């Protein structure tokens, strides 16, 4: 699940706290503050240019106190209790894997797998399917440990229900940044969901119907993962994910021979292109990466942010949520927002990217948040707290049960679905507005890329995702931009059922899924499993030599 709106609006939500607050307040004089806040900003972010200083002064005039509190807040370490090595079925030492050298075809010696692995270990527990009843298939859970930096990432693997010896392997990532991928497991595409009575309920449309799936809690301090340190940008998280996959496939080489895909949603629109690039940067690897899939993602803010106003104001296929005056205010704010995002793109520095996040989220997402409607589904009101889904409370209660934590080998004292501290860290590192779509052209030269979007989502809406795919500069740009949106028809029924629209050219595919919100597998489980299986089967990949 994405970023909660509190996430997306760390400032637009936490700072724009009241429903009556204007999108941006008029500047207020704070004579006692003088220049001290800006000096503190300079201490944190480094030297500010005159232009950047002016932007920060303006932003801090509008959010004088809570902004500094958010920037300087240091969260306490997550409580945990590490289990002894004797409780694990397998431990893979990264130093052992790194030490293996092999001989190439030309007689040259090289490491079997690239990348720095010596600080990492992988702990593996064989999960007894009968204990929890989530699925009957073979399962593993455990931790990737970065011993040098005291980081511990939790994962849960489910083998395919169909033909695990031949079916592909998929890594699933929820977004946030700071939301657990166990949300995806129990709310969207995993083998079971959790009822209000905290019972597991079988999901016939689970994505492990024809693929083995790894659910990963990342970055650290998300879900069951923990650390005394932190990760606050996508590039740093990519190193951890590469290490986890490398050690996992070293322990289970039978899965490394299968095709491998990375899928996720929301802020995974940042994660996935960078994680895939990290994997492909190693010429010697045991990860057979074949494609990536991003659902309702945030990848190119400059192309996507102009579509918040149309989606909220009745131009995305659903009735308007906001009043005409709110829509006009969003239009008025857009030019400045885009100028700030462009400045971030030009420098890729914190001092440009952080103000863009603060201003744009407040001006273009804030009005929708204050409407009380669900940012993940324009058809419904927000219920159950800032994340808008009461089911998340049931999932958290289930995953906080001692019996569940014991069965999985979890080492934290408690589970929470989203960690707002992680979100804040990423935002104030400037990661939110970074132009990560710039790595996609290189990926398109290597593998198929699917961008799909449920068309009822606001926060990462289909209009914006279609726009950035059509704007992407790469050799196939003209062909893809000119490609026709065609009906996506289900092949699982005798009668004709149109489940969405799709356009595809070369290795690039965009898909609009009808009736799906931010979490397509939750809203349209049968349709999502169908397009997923068809994608893994290569239906839209480039067949040219």
Curated annotation (Swiss-Prot):
It is an enzyme of class 3 (hydrolase). Residues 1-18 form the signal peptide. PROSITE patterns: CARBOXYPEPT_SER_SER. GO terms for cellular component: fungal-type vacuole. Its main location: other. It is found in: Vacuole. Disulfide bonds join 179-418, 313-327, 337-360, 344-353, 382-388. Pfam families: Carbpep_Y_N (PF05388), Peptidase_S10 (PF00450). Glycans are attached at residues 210, 487, 507. The keyword Hydrolase applies. One of its GO terms (biological process) is proteolysis. One of its GO terms (molecular function) is serine-type carboxypeptidase activity. The keyword Protease applies. The active site is at 266, 457, 518. Belongs to the peptidase S10 family. Vacuolar carboxypeptidase involved in degradation of small peptides. Digests preferentially peptides containing an aliphatic or hydrophobic residue in P1' position, as well as methionine, leucine or phenylalanine in P1 position of ester substrate. This is Carboxypeptidase Y homolog A. It comes from Ajellomyces capsulatus (strain NAm1 / WU24) (Darling's disease fungus). The gene is CPYA.
